[in-house]
Amino acid sequence: VSVLRIGNPSRVNDKMLSFTYERRFESHPDYPQLWSIRKAVRELYARMRKASNRESIRQKINSLKDRATELEIRINASLFAEARVIACTLVSSANRLLEGQKFGTLFIDEAAQALEAACWIPIRKVDRVILAGDHCQLPPTVKCPQALRAGLGETLMQTIVKNKPETVALLKLQYRMNEEIMRFSSDWFYGGMVQSAPEVKYRSILDFDTPIEWIDTEDMDCNEEFVGENYGRINKAEAELSVSQLKTYITKIGRERFLEERIDVGLISPYKAQVQYLRQLLKRDPFFKPYRSLITVNTVDGFQGQERDVILISLVRANEDGQIGFLSDLRRMNVAITRARMKLIILGDVSTLTRHAF
């Protein structure tokens, strides 16, 4: 299928550059002629500054510009005629290249993270819309509390799920994770309807391994600290324990096997401060040097859409009041626990976290 990617090429993965409009435009058979005309125009402009026959040069420039415009239109028409799929962001669908274009079908991927206002930009150009996403996972990021209260965080997908459930289809077979890791999410969020494909149902790294492991930090002097609005909270003792647990698990697997099979690991925390501290701990410890390319540390939001063989989650919250902050957002927790393919290790203070029904 011929795909044309519209948007800023600097934000495109290197593997996808060949699909960008800019690369396709410059690869078109008529482009060398267009480039020569543009070069001639630049040279004429340079000559015109010192020339006495400026009017004659200006006429030549205008004639060349008209020819260049004709070539641009012809190249664009050719590119769009060949393309079966136009790929772009919601906002990029307002690009001048797409002015006046009409399409049969619009697919919006990750629709549960898309602002409704942004969805309407491409919807105006199409006959049919298909939204793909998971409204039980993270919503769009809305930083303005007033806008959030006014409903900006409510997505078009949520509205459709709520008001037109007959149009919604659930993909019931998942190909990512061990069944035990999947089961809680399936039962809690999807009515127990999601099942594991046979090839992943019992997948594991170690024989007789427990796919899910909970480490209670209640009696380990793991206390949270508030470090500011932008970075949230940090629990240094829990971070150190997380790194220690990862070290133990890598040792169980064995260095050679870990590197040979390129077993990848994700360390997740809901708070930026904890993520930064975890990164520091890994960088300081020489044990992790051979494995650094296989270990990713990020927030829950930063991990949405990704997966790893092993996931460790540091939940951070540990206080006498049972305050868990945005951990009470069930969609965020759903994302966190479903990133793991074969092993999920969760670290947290049970006495704090069990105050919430989830």
What positions do the PLM features span?
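Conserved helicase motor core of SF1/SF2 NTP-dependent helicases
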Residues: 6-10, 14, 20, 30, ...
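Conserved helicase NTPase catalytic core signature
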Residues: 17-104
